[in-house]
């Protein structure tokens, strides 16, 4: 395979993990970061100890503080940043891009102020003439396991399947299997909203409830995700795939999940401010819950689990009381509630 340069915007766990994959595939990954300490550590020690402790990076993984240097000559630019920084980084990227480039984003969330998906934010901020294609790379994955080269599967979603296949070719190897899909909306809705349900799974575990409760929460949570997704144009089949149920399972059941860990602390009685301070990293489900709370009301979509998690996060609702209210809702036929 011909070596290609790929720029990765974001020196966090996911950006660094994807850089490792690209280096394993004999490509030339360059990470753009904004902290001297992390950039220098990647270049000098070949580690990123804050985000991926105990992982040794291939020497081919490079990092820079210069956006221009990172994207110069890159076939693909991967945007691997928290959703709250997406708009400002895309403004910078729009100024820096000199020619049409394949853009890939791996950020899972909804912008609360606008209810826009991340691809919509990117499209607003980066000129169409500079976007050769926009691909969503998503699925059931923890960066830590990708960096350990454990078997993982993702899906590259794009309206232009040729572009999705290019991304597939750059990242696929014996440790990371990539599928393609043309349902960008479904991939983004599944990836964003599962973080809310993962908070709920963590809360359930923190309260001491068992597997029955978590299985019910995940299943009914997926019903809510599908309901909203279909309302905004997703293919319902997408939610039975990697970016739907696959991503939900891994995020709700793993101690690697930031959203599960945050929910677990909430379930044990800590308040949101304490939890976020202890986490020290972005918990996307908190921001997404705020966005979807208003979005569901605007669309008149019934999302009782999401509403309950919002109330626990932002209205100091007692978690056990929230569960009691959910369990006491009027009876329904299951298939009519999807």
From Swiss-Prot:
It is found in: Cytoplasm. NADPH binds at residues 13-14, 108, 143, 258, 282, 284. GO terms for cellular component: cytosol. GO terms for molecular function: glycerol-3-phosphate dehydrogenase [NAD(P)+] activity; NAD binding. Its EC number is 1.1.1.94. It comes from the Bacteria. Pathway: Membrane lipid metabolism; glycerophospholipid metabolism. The keyword Coiled coil does not apply. Keywords: Cytoplasm, Lipid biosynthesis, Lipid metabolism, NAD, NADP, Nucleotide-binding, Oxidoreductase, Phospholipid biosynthesis, Phospholipid metabolism. GO terms for biological process: carbohydrate metabolic process; glycerol-3-phosphate biosynthetic process; glycerol-3-phosphate catabolic process; glycerophospholipid metabolic process; phospholipid biosynthetic process. InterPro entries: 6-PGluconate_DH-like_C_sf, 6PGD_dom2, G3P_DH_NAD-dep, G3P_DH_NAD-dep_C, G3P_DH_NAD-dep_N, NAD(P)-bd_dom_sf. Sn-glycerol 3-phosphate binds at residues 108, 139, 141, 194, 247, 257-259. It is an enzyme of class 1 (oxidoreductase). The active site is at 194 (proton acceptor). It catalyses: sn-glycerol 3-phosphate + NAD(+) = dihydroxyacetone phosphate + NADH + H(+); sn-glycerol 3-phosphate + NADP(+) = dihydroxyacetone phosphate + NADPH + H(+). Belongs to the NAD-dependent glycerol-3-phosphate dehydrogenase family. Catalyzes the reduction of the glycolytic intermediate dihydroxyacetone phosphate (DHAP) to sn-glycerol 3-phosphate (G3P), the key precursor for phospholipid synthesis. This is Glycerol-3-phosphate dehydrogenase [NAD(P)+]. The gene is gpsA.
